[in-house]
Design a protein with these regions (language model features):
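Helix-to-beta-strand junctions that scaffold the AdoMet/dcAdoMet cofactor pocket
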Residues: 70-72
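Active-site-proximal flexible loops/turns
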Residues: 5, 48-50, 87-89
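Mobile active-site "lid"/loop adjacent to the S-adenosyl-L-methionine
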Residues: 19-26, 35-65
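S-adenosyl-L-methionine
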Residues: 1-39
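C-terminal catalytic and target-recognition region of SAM-dependent MTase-like enzymes
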Residues: 23, 34, 61, 75-156
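Active-site-proximal loop/turn and secondary-structure-junction residues that shape catalytic pockets
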Residues: 1, 44, 82
Length: 156
């Protein structure tokens, strides 16, 4: 309700899509629609250390499909709430997903748990929340942008 009121006040167009199956929005590599912003808030796939490998694969697949749904220059907002997935593993998984999707990611913001969520030293509690905002570019367009910047630098 809050979101709807904000959208109406700002006269913005926002469409929400809730899906437990990201393949409903793609048919293999064919994407049916591109979005300016895609937000992922998946459940904790790794409830135990034993489930970590499968969980990382699931997070990778989900993020890979999401990256394909973002317009070039749009944003992917993604998160992970599994305490068994560390920050480095989270970023490595996203890097692998981006490579497989043919995308480049530019991290705009990263957050962990808020101040009201305690981090207990010596116990793996409190560091499970990972949240990141990325600008998503196709590898081809990113190369073009870099080439243009080099030309602009040469004229200075």
């Amino acid at each position: 309700d809050f979101l709807r009121k904000q959208v109406q006040m700002n006269k913005e167009y926002i469409e929400q899509l809730h899906s437990k199956n990201s393949s409903k929005r793609t048919n293999g590599d064919k994407v049916f629609r591109l979005w300016d912003v895609v937000i992922l808030n998946p459940p904790a796939f790794a409830k135990s250390q034993k489930e970590l490998k499968h969980a990382l694969r699931s997070y990778k697949d989900l993020n890979l499909h999401a990256m394909k749904l973002v317009v070039d220059g749009g944003f992917l907002i993604t998160s992970c709430s599994s305490r068994h997935v560390g920050f480095d593993q989270f970023l490595n998984m996203l890097e692998a997903a981006a490579a497989d999707a043919g995308k480049l990611l530019r991290m705009v913001n990263y957050r962990g748990a808020g101040e009201d969520y305690p981090h207990l030293i010596g116990v793996n509690i409190g560091n499970e929340l990972k949240f990141a905002v990325f600008e998503v570019r196709s590898r081809k367009s990113a190369a073009s942008v870099l080439q243009q910047r080099k030309k602009e630098e040469a004229y200075k």
